[in-house]
Structure formats: structure tokens, C-alpha cells
Amino acid sequence: MGQLHFFFFPVMAHGHMIPTLDMAKLFASRGVKATIITTPLNEFVFSKAIQRNKHLGIEIEIRLIKFPAVENGLPEECERLDQIPSDEKLPNFFKAVAMMQEPLEQLIEECRPDCLISDMFLPWTTDTAAKFNIPRIVFHGTSFFALCVENSVRLNKPFKNVSSDSETFVVPDLPHEIKLTRTQVSPFERSGEETAMTRMIKTVRESDSKSYGVVFNSFYELETDYVEHYTKVLGRRAWAIGPLSMCNRDIEDKAERGKKSSIDKHECLKWLDSKKPSSVVYVCFGSVANFTASQLHELAMGIEASGQEFIWVVRTELDNEDWLPEGFEERTKEKGLIIRGWAPQVLILDHESVGAFVTHCGWNSTLEGVSGGVPMVTWPVFAEQFFNEKLVTEVLKTGAGVGSIQWKRSASEGVKREAIAKAIKRVMVSEEADGFRNRAKAYKEMARKAIEEGGSSYTGLTTLLEDISTYSSTGH
């Protein structure tokens, strides 16, 4: 059997493309021929890192498919989820993505890969793969835990048994007692109405169940009960091969994942080097979560009231800075560093001065926090983030929440400065802080071992490659 060839096709969003790039690098480092499929305006996300890894003998090819934005009523430059002008245009975006099917089939015809690893949001790729008799493996970009919770919520609809939005219900049939409120479940799930998005989600689930299996950016020791639940109780074929961000050993790779950082990495490291171990709070809400100006104002006041040193990453599209409390930067200039734009997150979380991570609980960020051994202050906003929060606070017990209870795609609001300061202090300086820290450090060590030769994720990838090799030689 010759060299295996994998196609990697992420949906065009930073939170999906970056782990896919890491995954392609990981597969290539194990002797696989890796090809990433993307669109012309997203090539930059991958190209620099691919160039940088050439000297290590890691060869990754990029193949481009034109994105039909204009034909689907989107602005010409709109080739990424974060560039969509409004949520109303989400269906247009996915319609445009579906039009990439024919060019993808031409590429498969030409290159004859052995396997297609594609994003959950590309459900039509299951049929494409079947057409060429190659396995399609789904990449969700989230945790085993979140998918187990989501599955139970969908099947059992426990949110129907409560009389108010604030009353908690237990999610049935899980290894732990997980409690949620109605407003922490996505409106698509709880409304029961059919919309373009609910139809899309249904298609994604059906396509999932027909696919060959699912690959996870996670590791067995982190979610043991839920890996078992997903594979044995729900009966799905799955491989845990993460944390993918840990394949970035090089300082350049850690610093420049996805976009160029808005701060010089040396300046950032110098600032962190001048601080005591575990003394800095890192605040960052990913590339998609939106906050109202009043919520950002409360966050600033909460950070200041916590009395802790901090690095705060603020998205640049907030042109006017009316939300910054008057004199905030002046008062906190010794204590804090504000980064406007994109930060070298993995580099920051790996630094010993960082003692807590205020996060929206997107899975990439959550796992990067775990890999850095950093306790978390959880502030979920939408998607499956409320489920990931429960994994951190109830199962791993490596963090505490600010009390965010409202699933909101547009803009998070309603969390008060007192709650923010209290959660930060609880994780940083309360009598519980050492416990959070020790558990977080233990998971960091487990993560490191998982990706080393003989570790659970290393072995998981070996198994995946063997499975595909067998499939290729037998045709099933």
C-alpha cells in the first residue's frame, strides 16, 4: 500500500480552519499526503504556516475552489463566516458553500484521495465521498461532552419539563448530573419551528450518521466517560487525536496561527516575563462572539474591580471606544495590556505568568486553556459553549462561571461587573484557587503525554490511519 492521501476541507471560519491546518500538519508529520481545500481569500490562513513547516519535511498542498459569493447575494469579498453582513445571510453563505460540490468532485476525480475529512457544516460531502467510494470523516471542532449533551437534549427534550426559563433541568442519560436552564439551549432546539437553520442542522445530523466516523480535537484522559458514552452508548466510530494546537512546538507557529498578531510576540512575552507566576488574567472571547458596548463597559469595570493584572484582547471592529470607562487605560496602565485585534493566544496561555483565562468556551479556546494548564473563568455566549462550560466547571472542575445564562447569537449582555470580579477572584485568589490550578496543571500534563508516541491521541491517529489503509485496500 502506497502513501495515504487525505483531503481536509474545513468550513470557512477561523475557528474551523485553524484546527484543520493543525490536523493536516499532524497527519503530514506521520507520512500522510495532505491536501487542504479552501477558497482564494482564505489561502492566507494556511500558506505561511505551510511554508514555515517545509524545512521539517512536512509537505501540505492547498487546492482552491472559487467561492460563489455574489451569485448567492453576498458581498464579493465575503468568503468567511465572520464576514457575513448579518445573520439573515447565513443561509446564503451555506448555499454558496454547497455550490462548491461540483468543483470538489472534479478535484477528487483528479487526485483520487483515500479519505475526505470535512467539516460538519459540509453535510453534502458524505454523498460526494460515497460517489467515489472513499470514507468521509466528520470534523465537528467540538468536544465529545458537548455532542453527548446535545444528543440527549435533542432526544429527550428535558427543557419541556420546566415551568420557567430560570428553572434548571437535569440532562438525562449522562455519566454526570448536568443541569441547564432553557435559555442555555439554542433557540433552534427549543422553539420547534422549522427555519433554514434548523433544516441545515437536521441535514448535518443525518449526514453525520451516514459518514464513516468522527475525528475529535480532544484526548481520552480529558473526557474519558464521554468518549466511552459516544462510542459505546451512542455507537459512533470516533478517534480522539488532540490537542491539535500542541503540534505547534515552534514559537513562530504558536504566535501566528490564522492571522498575523496585532502585537509583536516579543513585546507580549516581555510584558508577561515581568509578571509573577499565575498572576495575570487573560481575557479573550474568540473571533465570533459579539458583546454590546454596555457589556464591554461592565467587563472593563469587572476586570478593574478584581484588582488583578490582565491582558485583554478586544476585537478591532469596535471603532469608537465609548465603551471604555473614562480613565480606565490610565488607571490600569501598570496592571494591564490591551491588545486590539488578534492575539498570539497559544503563546500567552503557555506562559507561566498567566493564572486564569476568561473565555467564551468555544472548544478551540477551551482546549488551548487545558493545554496551557490554565484555570478558566467561563462566559459562554452561543452555539455549544454552554455545554463546554459545564465540562470545565462540573466535570473537570478547573474553573468557575460568571453566570452567563442567555444563549445569544447577536450580542452578549446582562452580566454585571460584580459577578465578573467575583468569578475572577474566585479562580485567582480564593481558597479554591489552588484546587483549580492543581487540577488544570494535571490536565496539561495528561495532554502533553497524550500526543507523545505511545500516548492515547498518538495511538488514536495510528488507529485512524490503519482503518483508512484497510478501507483503501479492501474498498470498504
Curated annotation (Swiss-Prot):
Q: Which organism is it from?
A: Nicotiana tabacum (Common tobacco)
Q: Which InterPro entries match?
A: UDP_glucos_trans, UDP_glycos_trans_CS
Q: What is this protein called?
A: Scopoletin glucosyltransferase
Annotated binding of UDP-alpha-D-glucose, by residue: 343, 345, 360, 363-365, 368, 384-385
Q: Which UniProt keywords apply?
A: Glycosyltransferase, Transferase
Q: What does this protein do?
A: Glucosyltransferase acting preferentially on aromatic substrates of the phenylpropanoid types. The best substrates are scopoletin and esculetin. Required for full resistance to virus.
Q: What protein family is recorded?
A: Belongs to the UDP-glycosyltransferase family.
The positions annotated for binding an anthocyanidin are 16, 383
* Known EC number: 2.4.1.128
Source organism, top-level taxon = Eukaryota
